[in-house]
A protein has these predicted regions:
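Short, conserved, GDST-rich strand-edge loop motifs in beta-rich repeat architectures
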Residues: 76-100, 143-147, 242-257, 312-320
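Repeated scaffold domains used in trafficking and secretory/extracellular systems
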Residues: 61-65, 123-130, 170-180, 222-231, ...
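Short coil/turn segments that connect the beta-strands within blades of beta-propeller domains
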Residues: 70-71, 135-136, 181-183, 235-237, ...
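A short helix->beta-strand "capping" segment at the edge of beta-propeller domains
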Residues: 33-59
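Loop/turn-rich, solvent-exposed surfaces of beta-rich toroidal or solenoidal domains
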Residues: 222-271
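Short loop/turn segments that connect beta-strands within beta-propeller blades
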Residues: 108-113, 156-161, 200-204, 265-268
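A short beta-strand motif characteristic of beta-propeller blades
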Residues: 49-56, 113-121, 162-167, 210-220, ...
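Beta-strand-rich domains and repeat architectures in extracellular enzymes and scaffolds
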Residues: 51-94, 127-130
Length: 321
């Protein structure tokens, strides 16, 4: 092949790649729209079929959030070295001390083996929360282990596991989602009682992170679930999983009911809510900690990791179109 032919072939291949790559990047967007539409068809009567239960082959501590990229899981977790202690009376606006610990982001294969582990946070900021993947980065909030505190928001390259601090914020941010359509980041506070929105510039840094939290927050009008893990699902919506705990008396053992909320990011109101009537043998509700949902051939496949330390990845599927 002469030089001219090689140059022509190179040009053609380059043009084909430029056409294919955007299509590949956009392929996930219809999937998340399909997922959101199918979630809205779930109900209390939905039957979830167990697919597998995969033991996680290392100490997971207290898992918080999960994303699945291909056949790899990424799970945020807090290693509690010294539990927090409540004050008899609030001290400087806090109801407890900081405790001590280490924040982790684990990279795990589908057989439950640890591929990589990075630590996130600094000092008293060691509690990672719910996480989201935007097609390029995993967004991870790390906060003090108490309400009304402080947070550092990171984004992590899933290939290299390199973390980049994006900003700091004067409240406990317990979960984030990245709205890739209007270039904004959304956060939920301790117990998901408050919502935050940060506009992002071209570099992914917020343009309003220095604003007082009181100016940015909106109150969550739904009190059914405390959100643990949220994901962006297109059209300015997030899919949040979480739990509510109920006690017959203050000293009684809690009954834990898990569920899913499809929430509008425009006003923070739930568009759809449903319980998820699944529990592990330990009694822990499946949506208590990390959750990943995806559209499947049958309908929806859910990945759950509700238990601490010696965790199991529970995979369920339900038929819904």
């Amino acid at each position: 092949m002469d030089g001219f032919s090689r140059r022509c072939l190179t040009t053609i291949l380059t043009m084909l790649c430029l056409e294919v790559l955007p299509s590949a990047l956009m392929a996930a967007e219809p999937d998340r729209d399909v997922l959101a539409d199918r979630v809205a068809k779930l109900s209390r009567g939905t039957q979830w079929k167990p697919i597998s239960a995969v033991p996680i082959n290392f100490l997971t501590h207290h898992p918080q959030g999960m994303v699945k990229i291909g056949d790899t899981l990424f799970v945020s977790s807090v290693e509690i070295q010294q539990p927090t202690k409540r004050f008899p009376q609030p001290v400087d606006g806090y109801d407890r001390d900081t405790g001590a610990g280490v924040g982790h982001l684990f990279k795990i294969d589908m057989k439950g083996n640890l591929i990589a582990d990075i630590t996130l946070g600094e000092g008293t900021i060691y509690h990672p929360g719910g996480i989201d993947y935007d097609g390029k980065y995993i967004w991870v909030p790390v906060a003090e282990y108490r309400p009304n505190s402080r947070s550092i928001i990171y984004r992590v390259d899933p290939e290299t596991m390199k973390a980049e601090e994006m900003f700091r914020f004067a409240d406990h941010v317990g979960g984030v989602v990245h709205n890739t359509e209007d270039k904004s980041l959304h956060g939920v506070s301790w117990g998901s009682r408050r919502f935050y929105r940060w506009s992002l510039d071209a570099s992914g840094k917020p343009t309003n992170a220095s604003e007082a939290p009181e100016k940015l927050r909106a109150l969550n009008t739904s009190h059914y679930l405390d959100y643990q893990d949220c994901k962006y699902v297109g059209k300015s919506r997030m899919l949040c999983s979480g739990v509510t705990e109920m006690r017959v008396t203050p000293d009684a053992a809690p009954f834990r009911l898990g569920g899913l909320d499809l929430v509008s990011l425009a006003d923070g109101r739930p568009l759809f809510q449903t319980p998820v009537l699944l529990w592990a043998a330990s009694g822990m509700d499946m949506t208590h900690n990390p959750v990943w949902m995806e559209a499947s051939d049958a309908g929806i496949r859910g990945y759950f990791m509700p238990e601490d330390d010696k965790s199991t990845l529970y995979i369920y599927e339900t038929e819904v179109k």
